[in-house]
Structure formats: C-alpha cells, structure tokens
Amino acid sequence: MEKGRIVLASASPRRLELLASAGVEFDVCASDIPEEPIPGEAPADFATRLARDKAVATAARTEGRWFVGADTIVVCAGEIMGKPVDEADAVRMLRKLSGVSHEVITGYAVYDRERDGLLCKAVVTKVVFKPLRDEEISAYVATGCPMDKAGAYAIQGGAAYMVERIDGSYTNVVGLPLCEVVEDLRRIGAL
C-alpha cells in the first residue's frame, strides 16, 4: 500500500537536510504566512500556531497527503527572537544571548488531508552561550550567516563555538526536532 506524499511546508535548507537525513521522502512547498505573535501569546503557542498555519496553508494549494509545518524561535529573558531584521538587530540579539541561558522552541504540525487531522507539538531545548566579546559578535554577523536564523545564530555553523552547553534536542536547535517528528510521522502512518 502506498503511504501517500509528505510535503514539507518550508524552504529552510536546514529542515530539508534534517528530514532527508532520516530517510524520509518528501516534497517541498514553502509557505508564506505572517509571522507575528498575538499579544499575550505564549512562545510555545506562537511557534505551534505558525507551524499549524504553514501546514494548513500549504495543503490548501498543493497536492499531498501529510503536510509538515515548523517554526523555530529563540526566547531570552521573555523576548521572542525570530530572524534579525538587519545586522544591528543581529548584534543586539547576540549581545543579549551572550553568557546566558535561553530556550529554542520549535513548533511543528502535521496535517493529514485525508482524515482532516492535525497534530501540533512544541519542543523546547535550553541553550547556554559562553560570554561573547563584541569583536566575536561583529565578525560572526559580518559573515551574513545569522540573517536567516532565529536568534541570529546557527548552532551547526559558525556559532557552534559560542554554545557552552545544550539540554535537549540538538536538531531542534538546528530547526526541526527530528526524533519527535519522525516518530510522529511513523505513529500516524505516514512512514
């Protein structure tokens, strides 16, 4: 019996690489939804809502059976950090993260078109940065790497040395909690 098509509602190269590394066959159809929190919305609820909206919006405009949406945010001292708007914002974010613990939250959703079913979850990983010097921050921002990353850093790239420790899923910090997503896809019959 053919399982049907899985569609990843994201153009993130990191999410594509992660899902492919688990041997999952999928198509890609990026979603384009507004990414603004609702006043008073909890960070995990925000990330999960965006993931749900991405999965459902993608299902409305493309073929497939299961639609996987995801959104990753960084939360530090109560501030939800998405992608920086410019280099100055990236510097500000990295200064705030310097030497402190923060949370990386990825909300993910799997929409099953055939059953009109929706599974939504949030995975939280705690990350601690070493204290960063302004020169380190400036040099990293100058690479351009932080500009499309929540919290202005990529744990798997040039910012790896900034991370003192993590508690939780490494792949969650990269952009997709792979263990959880693959297990849920298996559980619902997509794999």
Swiss-Prot record:
Question: Record keywords: Cytoplasm included?
Answer: yes
Instruction: Tell me which UniProt keywords the record has, alphabetically.
Output: Cytoplasm, Hydrolase, Nucleotide metabolism
Provide the catalytic activity annotation.
Answer: dTTP + H2O = dTMP + diphosphate + H(+); UTP + H2O = UMP + diphosphate + H(+)
Name the residues annotated as catalytic in the UniProt entry.
D71
Q: Write down the required cofactor(s).
A: a divalent metal cation
Annotated disulfide bonds: none
The places in or outside the cell where this protein is found are: Cytoplasm
A GO biological-process term? nucleotide metabolic process
Top-tier EC class: hydrolase
Q: Where is this site: Important for substrate specificity?
A: R14, T72, Q156
Q: Name one GO molecular function term.
A: UTP diphosphatase activity
Specify the superkingdom.
Bacteria
This chain belongs to the protein called dTTP/UTP pyrophosphatase
What is the organism field in this record?
Answer: Geobacter sulfurreducens (strain ATCC 51573 / DSM 12127 / PCA)
